Protein backbone atom coordinates (compact mmCIF):
# COMPACT_ATOMS: atom_id res chain seq x y z
CA UNK A 1 0.00 0.00 0.00
CA UNK A 2 2.95 2.33 0.58
CA UNK A 3 6.41 2.95 -0.80
CA UNK A 4 9.48 3.96 1.20
CA UNK A 5 12.18 5.96 -0.51
CA UNK A 6 15.02 8.40 0.02
CA UNK A 7 14.49 11.87 -1.43
CA UNK A 8 15.62 15.48 -1.13
CA UNK A 9 14.38 18.83 -2.37
CA UNK A 10 15.94 20.16 -5.55
CA UNK A 11 17.81 18.44 -8.34
CA UNK A 12 21.47 19.09 -7.50
CA UNK A 13 24.05 16.34 -7.85
CA UNK A 14 24.72 16.34 -4.13
CA UNK A 15 21.18 16.47 -2.74
CA UNK A 16 21.35 12.82 -1.81
CA UNK A 17 23.86 13.79 0.92
CA UNK A 18 20.99 15.49 2.76
CA UNK A 19 18.24 13.04 1.75
CA UNK A 20 15.52 11.96 4.16
CA UNK A 21 13.37 8.82 4.26
CA UNK A 22 9.84 9.36 2.99
CA UNK A 23 6.76 7.21 2.63
CA UNK A 24 4.09 7.66 0.01
CA UNK A 25 0.88 5.78 -0.68
CA UNK A 26 0.83 3.61 -3.79
CA UNK A 27 -2.38 5.39 -4.79
CA UNK A 28 -0.58 8.74 -4.67
CA UNK A 29 -0.74 11.73 -2.36
CA UNK A 30 1.69 13.67 -0.24
CA UNK A 31 5.08 12.29 0.70
CA UNK A 32 5.71 12.06 4.44
CA UNK A 33 9.19 12.39 5.93
CA UNK A 34 9.75 9.76 8.61
CA UNK A 35 13.49 10.20 9.23
CA UNK A 36 16.11 12.91 8.85
CA UNK A 37 19.70 11.74 9.39
CA UNK A 38 22.32 13.74 11.29
CA UNK A 39 24.56 15.96 9.16
CA UNK A 40 27.49 13.53 9.39
CA UNK A 41 25.56 10.56 7.95
CA UNK A 42 23.87 9.54 4.73
CA UNK A 43 21.10 7.01 4.19
CA UNK A 44 20.26 4.45 1.52
CA UNK A 45 18.15 1.43 0.46
CA UNK A 46 15.07 1.66 2.74
CA UNK A 47 13.04 -1.56 3.01
CA UNK A 48 9.69 -2.28 4.66
CA UNK A 49 9.30 -4.81 7.46
CA UNK A 50 7.01 -7.75 6.62
CA UNK A 51 4.27 -6.34 8.90
CA UNK A 52 4.53 -2.84 7.42
CA UNK A 53 5.21 -1.24 10.80
CA UNK A 54 8.90 -0.38 10.35
CA UNK A 55 11.44 0.62 7.73
CA UNK A 56 15.03 -0.62 7.71
CA UNK A 57 17.82 1.31 6.03
CA UNK A 58 21.59 1.68 5.91
CA UNK A 59 23.20 4.77 7.40
CA UNK A 60 26.83 5.82 7.58
CA UNK A 61 29.33 8.31 6.30
CA UNK A 62 29.26 7.87 2.52
CA UNK A 63 31.37 9.85 0.08
CA UNK A 64 29.79 8.69 -3.20
CA UNK A 65 26.11 8.29 -4.02
CA UNK A 66 26.10 4.71 -5.35
CA UNK A 67 28.73 3.36 -2.93
CA UNK A 68 26.64 2.31 0.07
CA UNK A 69 28.12 1.30 3.40
CA UNK A 70 27.32 1.62 7.08
CA UNK A 71 25.19 0.17 9.86
CA UNK A 72 21.58 -1.04 9.66
CA UNK A 73 18.91 1.08 11.35
CA UNK A 74 15.17 0.65 11.90
CA UNK A 75 12.66 3.49 12.19
CA UNK A 76 8.88 3.26 12.88
CA UNK A 77 6.80 3.62 9.72
CA UNK A 78 5.05 6.66 11.22
CA UNK A 79 8.36 8.31 12.08
CA UNK A 80 10.36 8.59 15.26
CA UNK A 81 13.73 7.63 16.64
CA UNK A 82 15.88 5.29 14.56
CA UNK A 83 17.63 2.36 16.25
CA UNK A 84 21.01 1.00 15.15
CA UNK A 85 20.71 -2.80 15.20
CA UNK A 86 24.31 -3.52 14.09
CA UNK A 87 26.43 -1.26 16.32
CA UNK A 88 30.10 -2.14 16.39
CA UNK A 89 30.10 -4.82 13.69
CA UNK A 90 33.44 -5.14 11.89
CA UNK A 91 31.79 -4.98 8.49
CA UNK A 92 29.92 -2.51 6.27
CA UNK A 93 26.37 -3.26 5.17
CA UNK A 94 26.01 -2.56 1.43
CA UNK A 95 22.40 -3.57 0.66
CA UNK A 96 19.49 -5.13 2.51
CA UNK A 97 16.12 -6.79 2.15
CA UNK A 98 13.58 -7.78 4.81
CA UNK A 99 11.99 -11.15 3.93
CA UNK A 100 8.94 -12.73 5.49
CA UNK A 101 10.82 -14.71 8.16
CA UNK A 102 11.44 -11.39 9.94
CA UNK A 103 15.23 -11.38 9.82
CA UNK A 104 16.99 -8.75 7.71
CA UNK A 105 19.20 -10.14 4.97
CA UNK A 106 22.07 -7.88 3.96
CA UNK A 107 25.28 -7.71 2.00
CA UNK A 108 28.45 -7.16 3.96
CA UNK A 109 31.82 -5.84 2.87
CA UNK A 110 34.38 -7.20 5.29
CA UNK A 111 38.18 -7.31 5.22
CA UNK A 112 38.36 -6.97 1.43
CA UNK A 113 35.76 -9.69 0.88
CA UNK A 114 32.05 -9.76 0.09
CA UNK A 115 29.33 -11.73 1.81
CA UNK A 116 25.71 -12.21 2.82
CA UNK A 117 24.53 -12.13 6.43
CA UNK A 118 21.30 -11.81 8.38
CA UNK A 119 20.44 -9.98 11.56
CA UNK A 120 17.57 -10.39 14.00
CA UNK A 121 16.03 -6.90 14.29
CA UNK A 122 14.95 -7.55 17.88
CA UNK A 123 18.00 -9.18 19.45
CA UNK A 124 20.67 -7.96 17.04
CA UNK A 125 21.95 -11.53 16.66
CA UNK A 126 24.07 -11.86 13.52
CA UNK A 127 24.72 -14.84 11.28
CA UNK A 128 27.05 -14.91 8.28
CA UNK A 129 25.60 -17.03 5.47
CA UNK A 130 28.28 -16.60 2.79
CA UNK A 131 31.61 -14.85 2.51
CA UNK A 132 34.60 -14.93 0.22
CA UNK A 133 36.86 -13.05 -2.19
CA UNK A 134 35.35 -11.24 -5.15
CA UNK A 135 31.98 -9.53 -5.21
CA UNK A 136 28.35 -10.59 -5.21
CA UNK A 137 27.32 -8.01 -7.79
CA UNK A 138 28.54 -6.47 -11.02
CA UNK A 139 31.10 -3.69 -10.57
CA UNK A 140 30.44 -2.87 -6.99
CA UNK A 141 27.21 -0.93 -6.58
CA UNK A 142 23.59 -1.91 -6.09
CA UNK A 143 21.59 -4.73 -4.56
CA UNK A 144 23.34 -7.98 -5.34
CA UNK A 145 20.67 -10.58 -4.73
CA UNK A 146 17.16 -11.57 -5.79
CA UNK A 147 15.53 -13.55 -3.01
CA UNK A 148 12.87 -16.20 -3.62
CA UNK A 149 9.63 -16.30 -1.62
CA UNK A 150 11.00 -19.05 0.64
CA UNK A 151 13.66 -16.65 1.94
CA UNK A 152 16.37 -19.27 1.47
CA UNK A 153 16.89 -19.48 -2.28
CA UNK A 154 18.38 -16.64 -4.28
CA UNK A 155 19.83 -15.60 -7.60
CA UNK A 156 23.04 -13.61 -7.44
CA UNK A 157 25.75 -12.18 -9.68
CA UNK A 158 29.14 -13.52 -8.62
CA UNK A 159 32.54 -12.41 -9.85
CA UNK A 160 36.19 -12.34 -8.85
CA UNK A 161 39.54 -11.53 -10.39
CA UNK A 162 39.68 -15.15 -11.54
CA UNK A 163 36.10 -15.39 -12.87
CA UNK A 164 34.03 -12.82 -14.80
CA UNK A 165 30.47 -11.98 -13.69
CA UNK A 166 27.88 -14.72 -14.10
CA UNK A 167 24.47 -15.48 -12.59
CA UNK A 168 24.36 -18.14 -9.91
CA UNK A 169 21.25 -19.48 -8.15
CA UNK A 170 20.25 -21.83 -5.36
CA UNK A 171 20.24 -21.98 -1.59
CA UNK A 172 22.42 -19.17 -0.25
CA UNK A 173 26.08 -20.26 -0.22
CA UNK A 174 25.18 -23.40 -2.19
CA UNK A 175 24.71 -21.52 -5.45
CA UNK A 176 25.27 -23.18 -8.80
CA UNK A 177 26.34 -21.27 -11.89
CA UNK A 178 23.51 -21.00 -14.41
CA UNK A 179 24.99 -18.71 -17.07
CA UNK A 180 28.26 -18.80 -19.00
CA UNK A 181 27.90 -15.66 -21.06
CA UNK A 182 31.43 -14.51 -20.25
CA UNK A 183 33.15 -17.89 -20.49
CA UNK A 184 35.43 -16.64 -23.26
CA UNK A 185 36.94 -14.02 -20.95
CA UNK A 186 40.13 -15.26 -19.35
CA UNK A 187 42.27 -13.28 -16.90
CA UNK A 188 45.46 -11.93 -18.46
CA UNK A 189 46.80 -10.82 -15.08
CA UNK A 190 48.39 -12.55 -12.13
CA UNK A 191 47.01 -13.98 -8.90
CA UNK A 192 45.64 -11.68 -6.19
CA UNK A 193 46.63 -12.34 -2.59
CA UNK A 194 45.14 -10.72 0.50
CA UNK A 195 47.75 -9.17 2.77
CA UNK A 196 47.36 -7.80 6.29
CA UNK A 197 49.34 -5.37 8.41
CA UNK A 198 48.91 -3.12 11.43
CA UNK A 199 49.29 0.63 11.86
CA UNK A 200 48.20 3.07 14.55
CA UNK A 201 46.15 0.34 16.23
CA UNK A 202 44.24 -0.62 13.08
CA UNK A 203 44.25 -4.08 11.52
CA UNK A 204 44.54 -3.30 7.82
CA UNK A 205 44.01 -5.27 4.62
CA UNK A 206 44.78 -4.91 0.95
CA UNK A 207 45.16 -6.94 -2.22
CA UNK A 208 48.51 -7.65 -3.85
CA UNK A 209 48.15 -8.53 -7.51
CA UNK A 210 51.12 -10.49 -8.79
CA UNK A 211 52.76 -10.01 -12.20
CA UNK A 212 51.34 -12.22 -14.93
CA UNK A 213 53.17 -15.01 -16.73
CA UNK A 214 55.79 -15.67 -14.08
CA UNK A 215 56.57 -19.24 -13.07
CA UNK A 216 57.28 -18.55 -9.41
CA UNK A 217 58.60 -22.07 -8.85
CA UNK A 218 61.37 -21.36 -11.36
CA UNK A 219 61.78 -17.64 -10.73
CA UNK A 220 65.25 -16.39 -9.82
CA UNK A 221 65.02 -15.55 -6.09
CA UNK A 222 67.25 -12.53 -6.68
CA UNK A 223 64.98 -11.04 -9.34
CA UNK A 224 62.73 -8.22 -8.20
CA UNK A 225 59.82 -6.54 -9.93
CA UNK A 226 58.41 -3.00 -9.98
CA UNK A 227 55.22 -2.28 -8.04
CA UNK A 228 52.47 0.28 -8.54
CA UNK A 229 50.16 1.25 -5.68
CA UNK A 230 46.58 1.76 -6.90
CA UNK A 231 44.43 3.64 -4.37
CA UNK A 232 40.66 3.21 -4.67
CA UNK A 233 38.18 6.07 -4.98
CA UNK A 234 35.76 7.23 -2.33
CA UNK A 235 37.23 7.31 0.23
CA UNK A 236 34.13 5.46 1.47
CA UNK A 237 34.64 2.38 -0.67
CA UNK A 238 36.51 -0.90 -0.58
CA UNK A 239 38.93 -2.62 -2.91
CA UNK A 240 37.63 -6.10 -3.70
CA UNK A 241 39.40 -8.78 -5.69
CA UNK A 242 36.73 -8.29 -8.35
CA UNK A 243 36.68 -8.73 -12.11
CA UNK A 244 37.95 -5.43 -13.54
CA UNK A 245 35.63 -2.80 -14.92
CA UNK A 246 36.56 -0.33 -17.65
CA UNK A 247 38.45 1.90 -15.19
CA UNK A 248 40.55 -0.83 -13.56
CA UNK A 249 43.94 -0.23 -15.10
CA UNK A 250 45.75 -2.15 -12.36
CA UNK A 251 45.17 -5.45 -14.15
CA UNK A 252 46.85 -4.03 -17.27
CA UNK A 253 49.91 -3.27 -15.15
CA UNK A 254 49.91 -6.81 -13.75
CA UNK A 255 49.75 -8.14 -17.30
CA UNK A 256 52.75 -5.92 -18.13
CA UNK A 257 54.88 -7.40 -15.35
CA UNK A 258 54.13 -5.27 -12.28
CA UNK A 259 53.04 -6.06 -8.79
CA UNK A 260 49.96 -3.96 -8.04
CA UNK A 261 49.15 -3.15 -4.42
CA UNK A 262 45.52 -2.16 -3.75
CA UNK A 263 45.16 -1.10 -0.10
CA UNK A 264 42.08 -0.47 2.03
CA UNK A 265 43.29 2.29 4.37
CA UNK A 266 41.23 3.84 7.16
CA UNK A 267 38.21 5.56 5.67
CA UNK A 268 37.42 2.47 3.60
CA UNK A 269 34.50 0.10 4.03
CA UNK A 270 35.03 -3.38 5.39
CA UNK A 271 36.06 -2.89 9.02
CA UNK A 272 32.99 -1.25 10.53
CA UNK A 273 31.62 2.28 10.72
CA UNK A 274 34.25 3.54 13.20
CA UNK A 275 36.97 2.56 10.73
CA UNK A 276 35.18 4.29 7.86
CA UNK A 277 34.96 7.47 9.96
CA UNK A 278 38.60 7.28 11.07
CA UNK A 279 39.79 9.67 8.35
CA UNK A 280 37.32 12.45 9.22
CA UNK A 281 39.33 15.70 9.52
CA UNK A 282 42.43 13.60 8.82
CA UNK A 283 42.66 13.28 5.01
CA UNK A 284 46.25 12.68 3.92
CA UNK A 285 47.62 11.79 7.33
CA UNK A 286 46.41 8.57 8.94
CA UNK A 287 45.18 7.12 5.65
CA UNK A 288 48.51 7.96 3.99
CA UNK A 289 50.43 6.27 6.83
CA UNK A 290 48.26 3.19 6.38
CA UNK A 291 49.19 3.03 2.70
CA UNK A 292 52.89 3.55 3.31
CA UNK A 293 53.06 0.87 6.00
CA UNK A 294 51.12 -1.41 3.66
CA UNK A 295 53.87 -0.91 1.08
CA UNK A 296 56.39 -1.96 3.73
CA UNK A 297 54.39 -5.15 4.30
CA UNK A 298 54.20 -5.91 0.57
CA UNK A 299 57.99 -5.52 0.32
CA UNK A 300 58.37 -8.12 3.08
CA UNK A 301 56.10 -10.63 1.36
CA UNK A 302 57.04 -10.42 -2.31
CA UNK A 303 60.10 -9.83 -4.55
CA UNK A 304 59.46 -6.13 -5.12
CA UNK A 305 62.12 -3.59 -6.06
CA UNK A 306 61.79 -0.78 -3.51
CA UNK A 307 63.49 1.60 -5.95
CA UNK A 308 60.86 1.04 -8.66
CA UNK A 309 57.63 2.05 -6.95
CA UNK A 310 54.77 3.97 -8.54
CA UNK A 311 51.43 5.27 -7.29
CA UNK A 312 48.15 5.94 -9.04
CA UNK A 313 44.42 6.27 -8.46
CA UNK A 314 41.24 8.01 -9.54
CA UNK A 315 39.09 10.48 -7.58
CA UNK A 316 40.12 10.00 -3.92
CA UNK A 317 42.87 7.79 -5.33
CA UNK A 318 43.90 10.70 -7.56
CA UNK A 319 43.94 12.99 -4.53
CA UNK A 320 46.06 10.50 -2.60
CA UNK A 321 48.46 10.29 -5.55
CA UNK A 322 48.84 14.08 -5.58
CA UNK A 323 49.24 14.07 -1.81
CA UNK A 324 51.84 11.28 -1.87
CA UNK A 325 54.21 13.05 -4.26
CA UNK A 326 54.18 16.13 -2.01
CA UNK A 327 54.92 14.09 1.12
CA UNK A 328 57.60 11.61 0.03
CA UNK A 329 60.13 10.94 -2.70
CA UNK A 330 59.66 7.20 -2.32
CA UNK A 331 57.82 6.90 -5.64
CA UNK A 332 59.67 7.00 -8.95
CA UNK A 333 56.52 7.75 -10.96
CA UNK A 334 52.88 8.74 -10.41
CA UNK A 335 49.63 9.00 -12.37
CA UNK A 336 46.89 11.16 -10.79
CA UNK A 337 43.43 10.61 -12.27
CA UNK A 338 40.66 13.13 -11.51
CA UNK A 339 42.48 14.25 -8.39
CA UNK A 340 41.99 17.05 -5.87
CA UNK A 341 44.88 19.48 -5.53
CA UNK A 342 43.48 22.33 -3.45
CA UNK A 343 40.51 21.77 -1.15
CA UNK A 344 40.05 25.52 -0.68
CA UNK A 345 39.50 26.25 -4.38
CA UNK A 346 37.74 22.91 -4.84
CA UNK A 347 35.02 23.87 -2.37
CA UNK A 348 33.73 26.54 -4.74
CA UNK A 349 34.20 24.54 -7.95
CA UNK A 350 32.57 21.16 -7.41
CA UNK A 351 28.93 20.13 -7.69
CA UNK A 352 28.88 17.91 -4.60
CA UNK A 353 30.22 20.18 -1.84
CA UNK A 354 27.74 18.78 0.72
CA UNK A 355 30.08 15.81 1.23
CA UNK A 356 32.77 18.07 2.65
CA UNK A 357 31.31 19.27 5.95
CA UNK A 358 30.85 15.70 7.30
CA UNK A 359 34.46 14.87 6.41
CA UNK A 360 36.14 18.18 7.33
CA UNK A 361 33.97 19.22 10.26
CA UNK A 362 33.13 22.69 8.90
CA UNK A 363 32.82 24.59 5.65
CA UNK A 364 35.94 26.09 4.07
CA UNK A 365 34.63 29.53 5.01
CA UNK A 366 34.42 28.60 8.69
CA UNK A 367 37.70 26.69 8.97
CA UNK A 368 39.95 27.30 5.95
CA UNK A 369 43.02 25.90 7.69
CA UNK A 370 41.58 22.40 8.03
CA UNK A 371 41.25 22.41 4.23
CA UNK A 372 44.69 23.91 3.55
CA UNK A 373 46.42 21.40 5.82
CA UNK A 374 45.08 18.54 3.70
CA UNK A 375 45.67 20.09 0.27
CA UNK A 376 48.56 18.78 -1.86
CA UNK A 377 49.08 22.26 -3.30
CA UNK A 378 50.12 23.53 0.15
CA UNK A 379 53.19 21.29 0.00
CA UNK A 380 53.82 21.45 -3.75
CA UNK A 381 57.47 22.54 -3.46
CA UNK A 382 58.28 19.11 -2.02
CA UNK A 383 57.13 17.32 -5.20
CA UNK A 384 59.93 15.73 -7.24
CA UNK A 385 58.14 12.66 -8.68
CA UNK A 386 57.37 12.63 -12.44
CA UNK A 387 53.56 12.83 -12.53
CA UNK A 388 51.05 12.26 -15.32
CA UNK A 389 47.72 14.05 -14.69
CA UNK A 390 44.48 12.80 -16.31
CA UNK A 391 40.97 14.30 -16.13
CA UNK A 392 37.72 14.74 -18.05
CA UNK A 393 36.75 18.23 -19.20
CA UNK A 394 33.21 17.89 -17.77
CA UNK A 395 34.02 16.42 -14.36
CA UNK A 396 31.67 17.91 -11.77
CA UNK A 397 32.87 15.80 -8.84
CA UNK A 398 36.62 16.44 -9.14
CA UNK A 399 36.57 19.41 -11.54
CA UNK A 400 39.12 19.89 -14.30
CA UNK A 401 40.67 23.04 -12.71
CA UNK A 402 41.98 20.88 -9.87
CA UNK A 403 44.11 18.90 -12.31
CA UNK A 404 45.15 22.07 -14.15
CA UNK A 405 46.24 23.62 -10.86
CA UNK A 406 48.37 20.65 -9.86
CA UNK A 407 49.94 20.27 -13.32
CA UNK A 408 50.67 24.00 -13.50
CA UNK A 409 52.29 23.97 -10.07
CA UNK A 410 54.51 21.02 -10.98
CA UNK A 411 55.58 22.79 -14.17
CA UNK A 412 56.32 25.97 -12.25
CA UNK A 413 58.67 24.24 -9.82
CA UNK A 414 60.36 22.27 -12.61
CA UNK A 415 59.03 18.79 -11.82
CA UNK A 416 58.39 16.56 -14.84
CA UNK A 417 54.68 16.38 -15.62
CA UNK A 418 52.14 15.92 -18.40
CA UNK A 419 48.43 16.79 -18.49
CA UNK A 420 45.80 15.02 -20.62
CA UNK A 421 42.23 16.37 -20.67
CA UNK A 422 39.55 14.18 -22.28
CA UNK A 423 36.73 15.88 -24.17
CA UNK A 424 33.10 15.29 -23.17
CA UNK A 425 34.03 13.11 -20.20
CA UNK A 426 32.75 13.45 -16.67
CA UNK A 427 34.08 11.86 -13.52
CA UNK A 428 33.87 8.33 -14.89
CA UNK A 429 34.72 8.01 -18.58
CA UNK A 430 32.13 6.49 -20.91
CA UNK A 431 33.83 6.59 -24.32
CA UNK A 432 35.57 3.21 -24.85
CA UNK A 433 38.30 4.91 -26.88
CA UNK A 434 39.07 7.18 -23.93
CA UNK A 435 38.97 4.28 -21.47
CA UNK A 436 41.48 2.42 -23.61
CA UNK A 437 43.65 5.52 -23.99
CA UNK A 438 43.82 5.95 -20.21
CA UNK A 439 44.99 2.35 -19.75
CA UNK A 440 47.61 2.71 -22.48
CA UNK A 441 48.91 6.04 -21.16
CA UNK A 442 49.13 4.78 -17.60
CA UNK A 443 51.07 1.69 -18.69
CA UNK A 444 53.35 3.73 -20.97
CA UNK A 445 54.15 6.25 -18.21
CA UNK A 446 55.11 3.57 -15.71
CA UNK A 447 57.00 1.55 -18.34
CA UNK A 448 59.07 4.63 -19.12
CA UNK A 449 59.84 5.43 -15.48
CA UNK A 450 59.95 2.04 -13.74
CA UNK A 451 61.08 -0.55 -16.28
PLM feature segments, named:
Residues 25-29, 76-80, 120-124, 171-173:
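Short loop/turn segments that connect beta-strands within beta-propeller blades
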Residues 6-22, 33-47, 56-73, 84-94, ...:
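A flexible loop/linker signature enriched in serine peptidases of the S9 family
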Residues 1-3, 46-54, 96-103, 145-153:
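Blade-terminus and WD-like Trp-Asp/Gly-His loop motifs, strongest in beta-propeller folds
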Residues 32-36, 82-87, 126-131, 175-181:
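Beta-propeller fold detector
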Residues 22-24, 73-75, 117-119, 168-170, ...:
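Conserved hydrophobic/aromatic positions in well-ordered beta-strands
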Residues 39, 51, 87-90, 101, ...:
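Disulfide-stabilized cysteine-rich extracellular repeat microdomains
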Residues 7, 38, 50, 59, ...:
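Residues that line or immediately flank small-molecule/substrate-binding pockets and catalytic motifs
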Residues 142-451:
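Serine-hydrolase catalytic core recognition
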Amino acid sequence: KNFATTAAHGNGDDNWYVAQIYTIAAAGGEMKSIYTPPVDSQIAVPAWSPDGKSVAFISGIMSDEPAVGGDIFIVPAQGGEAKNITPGIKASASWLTWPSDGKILFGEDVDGESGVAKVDPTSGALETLARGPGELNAYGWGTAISLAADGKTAAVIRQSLAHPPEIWAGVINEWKQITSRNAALKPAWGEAKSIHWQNDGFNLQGWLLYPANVDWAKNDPAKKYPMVVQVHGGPSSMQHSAWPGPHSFGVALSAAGYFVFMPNPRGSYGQGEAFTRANVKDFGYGDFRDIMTGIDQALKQAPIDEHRLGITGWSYGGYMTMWAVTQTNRFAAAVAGAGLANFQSYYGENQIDKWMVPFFGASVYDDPQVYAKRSPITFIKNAKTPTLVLVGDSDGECPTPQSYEFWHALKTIGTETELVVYEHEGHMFVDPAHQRDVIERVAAWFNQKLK
